[in-house]
Regions:
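Feature representing long, continuous alpha-helical segments
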Residues: 55-56, 64, 152, 182-189
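Conserved Hanks-type protein kinase catalytic core
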Residues: 59
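Active-site acidic catalytic loop and adjacent metal/ATP-binding pocket
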Residues: 7-11, 19, 139-182
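Active-site activation/catalytic loop segments of kinase-like enzymes and analogous catalytic loops
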Residues: 184-210
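A conserved alpha-helical element in kinase catalytic cores
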Residues: 4, 16-56, 64, 69-92
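Protein kinase-like catalytic domain
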Residues: 39, 94-98, 192-195
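An alpha-helical support segment within catalytic cores of ATP-dependent transferases
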Residues: 98-152
Length: 210
């Protein structure tokens, strides 16, 4: 996926499952540094090998993604995902993550999203601009808390669960210093749209969020 930027292939070999990530050389080195930083904490599947420039092989994550866990709970009455475990998982990110270069702030991403929305929906540009002003004003007043280690792309496809508990994350390229609310807001923003994407799979999710 992400043509010309990166791709991930699944390899099922001799009863085992591995994932092969292909990246540009510079991104590959940054990725390996982040994986080494996370390794002692056991919060992401380990690197098995880096056989060539731009190529990393990792083990498969234990359990199922939070997206799968939510669907199983909503449709089949499986164990309800534990929200507290999400905080515990984020709390296991090593403090050294705070020394990494910061990612783009959420205010920058918000402005980009507003600009894109205005282009795609020109008839509602005024409404979008008004919403943007209110969101940015609220953000300026918000108490964000201390700078902590953050995942940077914390949402249901990147979080893996076992028996409803969040135990690991994947896709750690956006790892860096930030605020806890950044990761939680990212997750919440993804969760609130799941019922619209697939009501049959995620119809119970609004109740969990509430």
């Amino acid at each position: 996926y992400r043509p010309m930027r990166r791709a991930v292939l699944r390899a099922d070999v001799d009863g085992g499952r591995w994932f092969v990530k292909l990246q540009r050389p510079k991104r590959h080195l940054e990725y390996l540094e982040r994986m080494a930083l996370l390794a002692p904490a056991g919060v992401t599947p380990p690197v098995v090998a880096a056989p060539a420039e731009g190529v990393t092989i990792t083990a498969a994550a234990e359990g199922v993604s939070l997206a799968q866990a939510l669907a199983a709970w909503s449709m089949q009455g499986a164990v309800e995902p534990d929200p507290a475990s999400l905080l515990e998982l984020l709390g296991r990110l090593p403090g050294g993550v705070r020394t990494l270069p910061p990612q783009r702030g959420h205010d920058v991403r918000l402005r980009m999203a507003l600009e894109t929305a205005a282009v795609e929906l020109p008839g509602r540009a005024s409404e979008i601009a008004d919403l943007g002003e209110r969101l940015l004003a609220a953000d300026a007043r918000a108490e964000l808390g201390p700078v902590v280690a953050t995942h940077g792309d914390f949402y249901e496809a990147n979080i893996f669960t076992v028996d409803g508990r969040a135990v690991s994350v994947i896709d750690i390229e956006s790892l860096g210093p930030g605020h806890l609310v950044d990761d939680l807001a990212c997750l919440l923003a993804h969760l609130v749209v799941l019922p619209d994407l697939s009501p049959a799979h995620y119809g119970q999710v609004p109740g969990l969020i509430a």
